[in-house]
Amino acid sequence: MLGLVAGTCVGYLVQADRDPTPLTSLSQVTLTQAKGEAPEPLSAAQDRRVRTDGDLRKLLLKKPKGAKEADWLEGADGWMDLADYAADYDEPGNMFGSFLGSEFRRAAVTGWLAGDSSVEIRLVQYRQEETVAASEAAENGHYWAEREDGTESYPVPGTGDGMAYVHTKPFVELGGVSAYSARAFAWRGDIAMEIWVYDSKRISKQLIVDLAKRQMEQL
C-alpha cells in the first residue's frame, strides 16, 4: 500500500514539473448570415391575430339594409368596458369581480331593429394569460340556455362546439308584453361570441344559426 502511495506521489511530482501541453485550438463554426430583406409581415387575411388585435368592432356583422340602429346597447361607440358588460347581469358587483378574474380585456357590440325583431351581437375578448376564458364563457352560455324549458338547440356549422338556441315559450317583458327569444354562443381563440334575438313571434332556427355562422366566419 505504501509503495502505491509513493508511486502516485512521484508520478504527480514529475507531472507537476513539466510544462503544460498546449491544447489544440477548437474549430469555430461560422454561421452564414441570410441575405436579402426580411419577409413581409402577414396580412390580416393571413394571420387571425392581426385581425383580432385590431379594431374588434370591424369584425362584427354589419347592420342589414333597411334595419334601424339599436338604441339600447350598453357602452359607447360600439365598445363595452368591464363595468358596462357586468351591468347587464342581475348582480353587477359580483359579476364585475368574476369577469375581472376571468381576465376580461374588452368587448365590442352591435345591434339593430328589423320590424319586431331585435338583434344584439357581442364579441368578448379575454387576455387568457392564466385561463382559457373564451371557451369557458361559451360553456357558461350553453349551460344557462339549456336550463330553460321549451328550448331547442342546434349546432353552429364550422365552430366545433358552438350552439344556437331557440326558446319556444314566450317570456313576459317588464311592460307586460310577451316576447320570444333565441341566442347563440361560440368561441374562437381568445374571443367569445354572444348573439341575442328577440321577437313578438317565435324565432326561426334558420335566422339564429345563420347569424351565428356568419359572425363566426368573421373571426
Region locations from a protein language model:
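A short acidic-to-branched-hydrophobic micro-motif
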Residues: 106-135
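Extracytoplasmic/luminal low-complexity segments enriched in Pro/Gly and acidic/polar residues
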Residues: 173-219
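Hydrophobic, Leu/Ile/Phe/Ala-enriched alpha-helical segments that form helix-helix packing faces
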Residues: 111-112, 138-146, 215-219
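Short Gly/Thr-rich strand-loop-strand
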Residues: 130, 134-182
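A mature extracytoplasmic/lumenal domain signature
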Residues: 123-127, 138, 197-199, 212
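N-terminal "mature-domain start" segment
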Residues: 7-107
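N-terminal export and membrane-targeting signals
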Residues: 1-2
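Residue-level signal for secondary-structure boundary sites
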Residues: 18, 129-131, 203
